[in-house]
Each structure stands twice: as structure tokens, then as C-alpha cells.
Amino acid sequence: MKIAVDAMGGDHAPEALIEGALLAGPQCSADILVIGNEARLSSLLAHSGDSTSLKVVHAPQVIGMGEAGPMALRRKREASLTIAMRLLAENEVDAVVSAGNSSAVVSAARHLVGLIPGLRRPAMAVPLPTPSGKLLLLDAGAHAEATAIHLAQSAVLAHCYLKIEEGLNRPRIGLLNIGHEPAKGNRAVQRAFALLRRCSLEFTGNVEPNDLFAGKVDAVICDGFVGNVLLKMYEGFSETVCRFLESLANHDGRDFSGGAGRILERFRRDYHYEFVGGAPLLGIRKTVVAAHGRSRATAIANAIRLACRLQEARVFERLAGIVEEDGALTELRHQNTLLMIDQLKDKWGFAHR
């Protein structure tokens, strides 16, 4: 197995990417290729004292974090991200990990590697720890806006992914909204509600943010803007809780080396983004993991380990197979057509009363 790491992508590249790749290496049964400026990467590896465990692939260009993704891909065909995705598309590597420009990661994966047939676009999936287990969030940031069909297709991806990852035969899917009623939310959310209610998925209806962690759903669907805001709020809250508990212990003079310390460490490991590592880009035909832009070495190492695990279990390959065999996308298209016809009938009937 070979994993390509976009070593020039991210706020702390390339240092954090190289350090993370070196950390992941001993626990990942894969050859790791780091893609980027050869002179700079080789210098970092020499300085680390380990210049042989990673293979350097030269890339003369870098896509910046603030660049428009699709345009940057067209202009920078020899960027580290572009080369990594090209290697994946050509079967030279088995997975790609990048902490770079998320718009560029999504665009490169979509156009160079390709989508599952019938799918309009991919979605980032992030498992959020809750007291009752994990809650899968889609979309966590691949696309800021979404139509009803995009939201419904994300629900199909969540359904199929949870079948593989969690062994759930009928995972409960909720639609993130500001209220439980069908008429709540914007047009896209209202239409997605109507569409999902017609499908054979285990759709539980709208779910409000205050009910997200009550164990009522296994996955929650939203557009990438809302999902990314929710994810970062969640990350910020968990970090604040850790700091609050530490400051409380210091203020009270308590010793956190015993049981309380183990509880705090368990909380940090369960809820801190570094230990999640990255988000699989569901809907892409091959394994792509997008790491947080601010990732440092620990997060990068965990993102690489996640990519390694997903590839070993053939999750992306199996996901594509289940999506096609399940027939959910075909059903979705059919129900979307029927919904459009019904809505036109209602509109026509109203206009001719």
C-alpha cells in the first residue's frame, strides 16, 4: 500500500506534514510518499535524522490556502496536491492525505480521481463523539451551498458509509434544521425534507442543534457551510472545556495525575480534533482524507493512519459498490422527478381554481 501526503498543504506545512508522516510511519503498514519541494523536504528529513523512511516526490508548485480551488488547479498543474491526486488517479498510490486548501482538495479529487457514478458531488464526513456514541456529520465543509438533491445524496452516502463502518443495517438519518416542522428552514432544506420522506432510507426528519447529541440519529445532514461552522464550534467548545477543567484544577490546587487526570485525557482524546485526524471525502472513487488546515504533527499522523485503515478495509471501494447495488441514488432521482411533478400539479391546480 502507498499513501501520498500533500506535504505543502496546510497552515504549518511542510514541517508539520513531515513530522506527522514520520510519526505515522511505524504504525501504518504503507509506504508514505511526501509530495512537495524536494530540496526543502529532503532538508527537513535530514534534520530529523530519518531520511530513508519517506519517499520524496518533487512538486515545484504550491496551491495556497487562500486561492480559489478550481482556478488554482488549472493554473498549477505541477502543484503538490495536483500531483498527489494524479498519482491516485493513475493507481500509483492507494490514498491521498491533504491538509491543504479544502476547495482545491475537493476539486482535484472530483475532477482527477472521479465520483461514484450517479453522484453529483462528494461530501466530507466527520464523526462527532457523543455520550451515546458517534454522530456522523455530512457535509463538514466540501461545499458551502447545497440544493435539495445534494442534501439527499449526502444522506445516501451517510446511509451506505455507516453500513460499512458501524455495521448499522438501518442507520437513522436526520436533517439539520431550526425546527422539527417540515415547513422550517430554507427552500433547499424544505425540499430535501420532502424528498427524503419519500425515500426508503431511515429518515427521522428534522433535527435541531440542541438534539444532535441526544442519540436520536446516527448521521446528520447539512450543507458544507453550516457543517463547517458546527464542526469548528464543536472543536472550540471541547478545547474550552479542557482548558476550563485544567484551570479549575490549578486554581483549586487539585492533582490531575490520578483518576481525574485520566478522565481529562480520555475527554481530550475523544473530543479533540487532533485525534480524529481527518475527514474522508465520501463519494470519491478512491481513498481521499482531508485534514484540518491548522493540523500539526499529531493530527497529520492520525489522518494518515485513518487513510491507511480505510484503504486496508477497502471502505471507499465497498462504498461505491453498495451505493450502486443499493439503488438509493436511482430511487432518489425517481422520487425527485415525482416530487417535481406533484409540485407542478399543485401549482397548476392552484392557478386554475
UniProtKB/Swiss-Prot annotation:
HAMAP family: PlsX (MF_00019). Its main location: cytoplasm. Gene3D superfamilies: Isopropylmalate Dehydrogenase. Its EC number is 2.3.1.274. This is Phosphate acyltransferase. It catalyses: a fatty acyl-[ACP] + phosphate = an acyl phosphate + holo-[ACP]. Keywords: Cytoplasm, Lipid biosynthesis, Lipid metabolism, Phospholipid biosynthesis, Phospholipid metabolism, Transferase. GO terms for cellular component: cytoplasm. GO terms for molecular function: phosphate:acyl-[acyl carrier protein] acyltransferase activity. Pfam families: FA_synthesis (PF02504). Signal peptide: none annotated. Belongs to the PlsX family. It comes from Syntrophobacter fumaroxidans (strain DSM 10017 / MPOB). Homodimer. Probably interacts with PlsY. It is found in: Cytoplasm. It comes from the Bacteria. Pathway: Lipid metabolism; phospholipid metabolism. Catalyzes the reversible formation of acyl-phosphate (acyl-PO(4)) from acyl-[acyl-carrier-protein] (acyl-ACP). This enzyme utilizes acyl-ACP as fatty acyl donor, but not acyl-CoA. One of its GO terms (biological process) is phospholipid biosynthetic process. Coiled coil: none annotated.
